[in-house]
């Protein structure tokens, strides 16, 4: 039976009231001036932490956690946890905060649904991906200590935090993965060690018996393939350095070639064929990455191969992303970066206003591709809108056709 609200003190009632009104400064004052336990519950069995998660207020949640709130506590009448409420709120950063404080990912409510399943039910796909891609820090700490006959750990201890963040990335577009590797302190300089740790993680995920996680195993494999491609690119650049003089460093567009290995690879990933606009190098790389997954009997491998081998298959990057993060419905209003496919890209090309990017860096990297079409896109916005409408209609027809042909 749920507790009665009549049993709450005036201070406890005030805390609930301030949380529900998102009054952050008042909550901060109440918590700092009154050293109380914050795991009390209201008439529905909800704690202050659960209320703050329901509101999606990360700042208040952080205050409550700092005050000692139990991330898994609660007496909710339908067994919803704080992570359930955070997932329903749509705040992926809040979900990550709770999980980093020990929130149970597999906790189920009264209808047997986990936080990730509830997030998927209401269409909060970012929360689903964040929860499914979360990895406990303890899984990484194993590799920062020498094991068995090893004379040194596989992963230098000072790289543990940046590596942990790198492997939990949700956006697995190869351009974004390469950029994240470059931006993570120390990882690019230790790319060979990073690749070996990823391969070890892949093997461990596939040898856990009943707890085998094919999705995470493939994700580790895929990340290791991107790292390996950067290593190969670096070796090619090193071999070329002694063979070419400064004049040979001028490319076909009359610009000086960049010595940045990651940028060279990104430009290869982005370069599209003139005939059909498909990024051929990226497509070939991703298909080869799938083929190289060593666990051929796994369900995830068979599904991806079957999809890519079908007639008129989707892009390889969409297949890889769906395998790791799950399928998701259409979202016509989603603003996706044209360079790395990061969502909520708010920066538009200042000339044509037809494409969007995460930031100036993504726009710069994509400019060599976009500049050929920029003027045309800017001159005929009505035609572009018409084309998009036709594309949406075509996609809708194809999807409906596929659904009708599914076996009963």
What residues fall within each predicted segment?
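Ankyrin-repeat junction/capping positions
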Residues: 39, 72-74, 106
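Ankyrin repeat domain, specifically the short helix-to-loop turn at the C-terminus of the second helix
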Residues: 29-36, 62-70, 96-104, 132-138
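Conserved ankyrin/ankyrin-like repeat signature
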Residues: 26, 59-60, 93-94, 126-130
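Start-of-repeat signature of ankyrin repeats
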Residues: 11, 45, 78-79, 112
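Ankyrin-repeat-protein effector appendages
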Residues: 2-14, 120-342, 347, 367-408
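Ankyrin repeat boundary/linker residues
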Residues: 8, 42, 75-76, 109
């Amino acid at each position: 039976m749920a507790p009665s609200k009549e049993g709450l003190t005036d201070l406890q009632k005030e805390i609930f009231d301030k949380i529900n009104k998102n009054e952050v400064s008042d909550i901060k004052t109440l918590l700092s001036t009154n050293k109380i336990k914050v795991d009390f519950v209201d008439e529905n069995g909800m704690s202050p932490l659960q209320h703050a998660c329901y509101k999606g207020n990360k700042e208040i949640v952080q205050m409550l956690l700092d005050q000692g709130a139990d991330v898994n506590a609660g007496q909710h009448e339908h067994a919803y946890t704080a992570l359930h409420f955070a997932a329903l709120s749509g705040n992926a950063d809040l979900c990550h905060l709770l999980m980093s404080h020990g929130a149970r990912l597999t906790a189920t409510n009264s209808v047997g649904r986990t936080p990730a399943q509830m997030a998927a039910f209401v269409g909060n796909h970012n929360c689903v991906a964040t929860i499914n891609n979360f990895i406990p820090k303890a899984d990484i700490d194993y590799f920062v200590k020498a094991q068995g006959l090893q004379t040194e750990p596989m992963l230098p201890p000072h790289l543990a935090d940046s590596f942990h963040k790198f492997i939990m990335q949700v956006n697995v577009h190869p351009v974004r993965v390469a950029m994240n590797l470059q931006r993570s302190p120390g990882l690019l300089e230790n790319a060979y060690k990073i690749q070996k740790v990823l391969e070890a993680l892949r093997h461990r995920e596939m040898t856990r018996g009943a707890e085998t996680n094919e999705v995470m195993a493939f994700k580790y494999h895929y990340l290791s393939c991107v790292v390996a491609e950067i290593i190969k690119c670096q070796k090619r650049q090193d071999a070329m350095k002694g063979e070419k003089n400064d004049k040979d460093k001028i490319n076909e567009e009359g610009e000086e070639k960049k010595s940045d290995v990651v940028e060279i690879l990104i430009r290869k990933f982005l370069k599209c064929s003139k005939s059909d606009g498909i990024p051929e190098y990226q497509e070939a790389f991703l298909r080869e990455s799938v083929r190289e997954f060593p666990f051929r009997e796994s369900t995830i491998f068979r599904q991806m191969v079957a999809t890519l081998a079908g007639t008129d298959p989707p892009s390889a990057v969409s297949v890889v992303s769906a395998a790791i993060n799950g399928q998701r419905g259409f979202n016509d209003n989603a603003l996706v970066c044209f360079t790395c496919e990061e969502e909520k890209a708010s920066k538009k090309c200042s000339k044509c206003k037809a494409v969007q990017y995460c930031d100036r860096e993504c726009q710069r990297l994509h400019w060599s591709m976009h500049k050929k079409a920029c003027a045309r896109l800017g001159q005929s916005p009505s035609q572009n809108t018409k084309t998009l409408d036709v594309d949406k209609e075509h996609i809708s027809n194809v999807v409906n056709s596929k659904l009708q042909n599914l076996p009963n």
